[in-house]
Amino acid sequence: MSPGKLTLSRGHKLTIINSKRYIFSAAFAALTALAAPTAATAAVEQSQCGEVTITQMNWDSAAIVTAVSKFLMEQGYGCDVTAVPSDTTPAITSLSENNEPDIVTELWVNSTGDVYKKLKADGNIVELTSVLDPGGVEGWWLPTYLVEAHPELATIEGVMANPELVGGMFNNCPDGWGCRIVNDNMIRAFNLEESGIKVFNHGSGQTLATSMAAAYQSEEPWFGYYWGPTTPMGKFAMTSIDLGEYDKDIHQANQNADTPNPKASSFPAAPIVTVVTKDFMKANPEIAELMSNVTFKTSTMSQLLSWKDANNASSEEAAVYFLKNNQDAWSGWINEAATEKLSALLK
């Protein structure tokens, strides 16, 4: 054992993790108890709101959105909420074929195709809000400490003029990812390799994330693609370099591997929304209003994901953490009656 370093056995590690989970689970139970109405009041509220179905998409940020929304609907509005496991394509297909679930949240519009456009145009669904602001973010990033030490690196021109300052390497997406095609075209458009920056194509998302973490923890250069909301973007202070103006036509062309003469364009924010069915909107205007207010900064969600990862927490436990530490944010989402019911949490 090295001096000053404590080595834990696997059993001790599991004990600590399980202890954390017990604490977080207890906190969730306590939070629910604080907000819970009396049995008689709850019965009246349930009859007023009734049953609500909401997607539980199979990625962490969406699960947190659902957990927060479910808690507020149940404890503030007396709803009986069922979280329906789903993904983008199954959710949009179910809306089209079955007019359910009632609420679909963290829907990445760019992945829904023409089905979403038709549902919206036909008035079958109502788009309530951008649940993540400004949406899904993509870019080419440097550690903020590197840009602060060398401000000229804030632009792609500055990076290409100083390849040694960024480690002489660009960390690219794995093969098969959509961002790989865009990045490859951007690399050609900028003549990046001619500036002395080699391109390293990662074999997986895990190695891409690990490369960032290793560089950051050693305060070494790192230059590459990443996106948010994600755990690494919440854990590490990163700066998106200026790639020039966004051009819709150029960006769309860059999504095709056979684009003959690619040009440069920055990445747009991907729209990520919450929608409800038209029928639900009419029957439950107060819940629709609530869900139109439930929105997170993309950076805040990345920080929540980082906290969840560091504490080996569940999505429900991350929701508790958010609710306990961000009252100023979510207290503005709920109506007066819900504020009264949840008053114990707002003290």
Where are these regions (language model features)?
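An extracytoplasmic/periplasmic, membrane-proximal ligand-sensing/linker region
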Residues: 50, 61, 188-195, 202-219, ...
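Ligand-binding cleft/hinge of the Venus flytrap
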Residues: 69-77, 163-198
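Ligand-binding pocket segment of bilobal, Venus flytrap-like solute-binding proteins
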Residues: 93-95, 101-105, 179-256
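Short, well-ordered beta-strand elements
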Residues: 46-61, 79-84, 167-171, 291
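Immediate post-signal peptide segment of exported/extracytoplasmic ligand-binding proteins
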Residues: 41-54, 161-167, 330-333, 347
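A bilobed periplasmic-binding-protein/Venus flytrap-type ligand-binding module shared by bacterial periplasmic
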Residues: 138-148, 271-283, 304-307
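C-terminal lobe and pocket-closing loops
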Residues: 232-295
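A conserved helix-loop-strand patch within extracytoplasmic ligand-binding domains
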Residues: 124-174
